[in-house]
Amino acid sequence: MARKKSRSSSTRKGSSLKVPEIKEKEKINAINTYEDVANSEDEFYNAQDKILFDADNGEQADELELSDEELVALESSSDEEDGNAEENLSENEELSGKKKDAVNEEELYDNKGWGRSAKSYYGGDDYDNEDYSEEDDEFDARMEEQEALRLQRKRLEKVSETDAIDDISQWADNSDLKSIKQDSSAAAIEELVQQISPDLPRTELLKILEAKHPEFQLFLDELNQLKPQLNEIKEKLKTYPSSQLLQAQCTALSTYISFLTFYFALLKDGEEDLKNHPIMVDLVRCKQTWESYCGLDEVLTPTSLEEDGKTIELHEKIASASDIGASEDEEDVDMHESISDNENEGIKDIPVAEDDDITLKFRAAKSKINTNIKNLDDYGEGNRLDDVDAEDKIARKRSLKFYANQIDQKAAKRSRAVLELSGDLDMPYKERRFERQQRLMREAAARGRNQDAGADLDDEDPESMGIPANVDREVEDQDDLDYYESLDKKSKMAKKLRKENHDLERDLIRASRHPELIELGEGDKRGITLDIAKNRGLTPRRPKENRNPRLKKRMRYEKAKKKLASKKAIYKGAPQGGYAGEQTGIKAGLVKSIKLQ
């Protein structure tokens, strides 16, 4: 067998290689983790990723606050920049130190100022607390009073006399500035007045007048604009003299124009201070009155004047035929009733302005004036009312008694109409066969009584006797026509009743909107408003259940039970008696149908 070669030769050759020496300064630690080879940037992000479970609240707050610590170190370009950065850093540290001191002082003051407990500022309206009692309320009130007194003393200690002196000096400076401005403006106006001479052009004179009296041009334009309107209203008033709205507009506008003219007269006489003159107050009041009437429009028709005259004549003739001992109010009510009840003498009243809130619209019916009224003429009786009588009539219409009589009258008419048009009387039904036979028999009997006594009445055909076969048909058509005419008459009466109700509501609304037009008699008082009658003030509504916490919880529990019963089946106890079958939910005493009137 062959012997194995020894490796002594190779070891001897390898032992001849030199091993480099390792210096102490170049030694490094063993690399076991990622942190062993991390640089400064990696260390910063590792510190950010750590979660400190045992850290205090103060340390967490410091971490959340803004800091001046640099994230990544940047190399500076020169030594000068390093010096400037150090100076800026020192200044920032000083400023931040001052700010922290100021914040600490403010926090101390705020902590003392906001009280010792949060109960004083939260939960003041929570009355549902079961542990709440009157003793706690008194204790809270005492503590609140003590805290308020302490805060007041603390603030008064900081106030000094110099604060008040500074305010007084500042007020004095402001008043001096205002007086100086007023004196300067007055002096400037006086200088402009002194510069007036007859040689100045018209434009310069207008500038001086505008500086001294700025309201002059406005009043002049308004006067030139209102004069044509006054003439138009006067022309309308001549055409419609019974229109109360036109009379009020004419009075308001003429008063306003007269005050404007008086203003120009004072200015012409040399009155200097017109801004403080009492006429300015009167001008403002007249302008407001005119603007309140200016927006109102009245619907006037060309025939309203003629109808007004005819209505007055009819009122006079009916009033002359009434009893001597009747009072004026009763006469007025009787006149209205006689006119409204007479269908052939239906006369339209004077049209007035329609209210926007009332949406009912009626079609204007044609006026049917009886021609016999025109021919009526009593000897010695006037054809038109005198001015005094007309004023008395208008005054009666403005009184509350007139409206009360109208309300009673229209309520009586409404009740009569309800009785007449109740049920199915206004519904057209087909005539029954039996009723038609009875009606034809009555008509035949009436015709037989009107015929001669010697007429031949036998069983022969009427056509063979020369009597036309459509006689009954014509009579039937005439009856149908009369029936439908009666229905038309009833519908017109119902429409007339609706119009009267509409007029009544309109008059009441107009009287409530313009209470100044209602003249109160002796002993009458104006009614109070709804706010005064209720006397609620500004107190919010609070339910009575809040006063009793036990009752409030009980009601809340009952409400929750009802809500739960609507969502799922609730056991309500064992059924009483024997088995009566499944319940249908139909109740014998419950009626949900609508009863026809």
Swiss-Prot record:
Swiss-Prot/TrEMBL GO biological process terms: maturation of SSU-rRNA from tricistronic rRNA transcript (SSU-rRNA, 5.8S rRNA, LSU-rRNA)
Database matches in PANTHER family: SOMETHING ABOUT SILENCING PROTEIN 10, SOMETHING ABOUT SILENCING PROTEIN 10-RELATED
Name this polypeptide is given: Uncharacterized protein C3B8.09
Domain of life of the organism encoding this protein: Eukaryota
Entry GO CC: nucleolus; nucleus; small-subunit processome
Chain segments carrying region Disordered: 1-23, 71-143, 444-464
Subcellular location: Nucleus, Nucleolus
Record's compositionally biased regions (Acidic residues): 71-94, 125-139
Modified residues annotated as Phosphoserine in this record: S40, S133, S327, S340
Family: Belongs to the SAS10 family.
One GO MF term attached to the UniProt entry: snoRNA binding
